[in-house]
Amino acid sequence: MNWLETALSTSSLKEAPAVAVLHLGCEKNRVDTEHMLGLLAQAGYRVEGDEDSADYVIVNTCSFIEAARRESVSTLMELAVQGKKIIIAGCLAQHFQEELLREIPEAVAIVGTGDYHQIVQVIQRAERGERVNAVTSSLDYIADETVPRYRTTHAPVAYLRVAEGCDYRCSFCIIPHLRGKQRSRPIESILREAEQLAAEGVQELILISQITTNYGLDLYGEPRLAELIRALGQIPIPWIRMLYAYPTGITPAVVEAIQETPNFLLYLDLPLQHSHPAILKAMNRPWQGQVNDRLIERLRQALPKAVLRTSFIVGFPGETEEHFQHLLEFVQRHQFDHVGVFTFSPEEGTPAYHLPQQVPEPLKEERRARLMQLQQGIAFRRNREQVGQVVPVLLEQENPRTGEWIGRSPRFAPEVDGVVYVRGPGSLGSLVPVQITRAEPYDLFGQVVEAPAGFSWSGR
């Protein structure tokens, strides 16, 4: 029995308030949620999986773009209608604390992105009848391996936050205002948490921060991602994946570290945002000298087996049909494995909010659909190349009715990419060799087989 199970089973908890936590938004928000759950359980609160039976409902909100805000507000209003005592946490709380407290009387507390570690004290104050505004403008906190954490992901998968905040100022992005400046964890702290997760049986470790490739710059005076990759390569976890790499941060030193670390997956998440120099310049992104083309070509040469994921924004202010055609040609030329496409969301407080030549919403949606249609064909072609190959698959779910497994190969990251549907023997949380028998645009299908000679469990 682990510490959480022990805490949840003690009789004293029967008198403690029950708390449910709803997580919205990205993986960074998920880690905050997991730390709040861990702190609450350690303090003796009953953590419920269902908000209906909870005394308090904590909603860890997202405020990255308009659609995320709408989802967060909709969730809060549904709970308010039910008469729940709500604690609003996360990015929406950081962004709009006064408005939320004014408009949602059911909110007994509000907790900012730099204050989630005080969740126990916040609830204690709310229990005494205080309406709590725990939002600080001093965004300098980052949890380490000593802070209790209860993972909400599938058992074999864990996110590992290496840094928090961002020092870049992309003209469309509100994140630096919501999360503060970059603050990296020491390598030793990250390695200790990785060892803890390995001891829990984690099979896939996913490195995250706002700009993962800038890891260590604030702490050591220079990026230390290459050193971190090599150090994590010594941890007994079969798969290590990295998300949120800034294009110019994939330096030759980082590429060399990836090449030399067998359990580091050949999967690169590079949010490029656009291809046309004029739009990139307006976004305050790297834009000179075909920087993105050169990067992709260099990566294809150095890491020919690498899976490339990227994301783009369409409908940025001033984007013309010529600019958009440039983006279509860029995607066609580079044949990315996975692409996410967002329509520009004007965020108050960012430079792009005031730019002229705002693109009409219907045109944004049309361009998004055209780009996604192009990428669907590319993704299907990429997936069809997998048919006949034997690849490692991490089994994450089982369909009890059919006996079919649902898992992922190294080419698929959780939540954002596809899955592999697997038939054959296996166990939950295990890695198995699977021969791919069929492909769809976003998913694969296969059968468990014997591992061939020289089989790579990281898919290299």
Swiss-Prot record:
Compartmental location: Cytoplasm
Binding-site list for [4Fe-4S] cluster 2: 166, 170, 173
Domain (TRAM): residue spans on this chain: 384-450
EC nos: 2.8.4.4
An individual GO BP term: tRNA modification
Cofactor note: Binds 2 [4Fe-4S] clusters. One cluster is coordinated with 3 cysteines and an exchangeable S-adenosyl-L-methionine.
GO MF term (any one): 4 iron, 4 sulfur cluster binding
InterPro entries documented for this protein: Elp3/MiaA/NifB-like_rSAM, Methylthiotransferase, Methylthiotransferase_CS, Methylthiotransferase_N, Methylthiotransferase_N_sf, NA-bd_OB-fold, Ribosomal_uS12_MeSTrfase_RimO, rSAM
Any one annotated GO CC term: cytosol
Necessary cofactors: [4Fe-4S] cluster
EC top class named in words: transferase
All copies of domain MTTase N-terminal, residue ranges: 17-128
Residue span(s) of domain Radical SAM core: 152-381
UniProt main location, coarse: cytoplasm
Positions annotated to bind [4Fe-4S] cluster 1: 26, 62, 91
Keywords from the named record: 4Fe-4S, Cytoplasm, Iron, Iron-sulfur, Metal-binding, S-adenosyl-L-methionine, Transferase
Catalyzed reactions per annotation: L-aspartate(89)-[ribosomal protein uS12]-hydrogen + (sulfur carrier)-SH + AH2 + 2 S-adenosyl-L-methionine = 3-methylsulfanyl-L-aspartate(89)-[ribosomal protein uS12]-hydrogen + (sulfur carrier)-H + 5'-deoxyadenosine + L-methionine + A + S-adenosyl-L-homocysteine + 2 H(+)
Matching NCBIfam families: 30S ribosomal protein S12 methylthiotransferase RimO, MiaB/RimO family radical SAM methylthiotransferase
Function: Catalyzes the methylthiolation of an aspartic acid residue of ribosomal protein uS12.
Family membership noted in the UniProt record: Belongs to the methylthiotransferase family. RimO subfamily.
This protein's name: Ribosomal protein uS12 methylthiotransferase RimO
Organism: Synechococcus sp. (strain JA-3-3Ab)
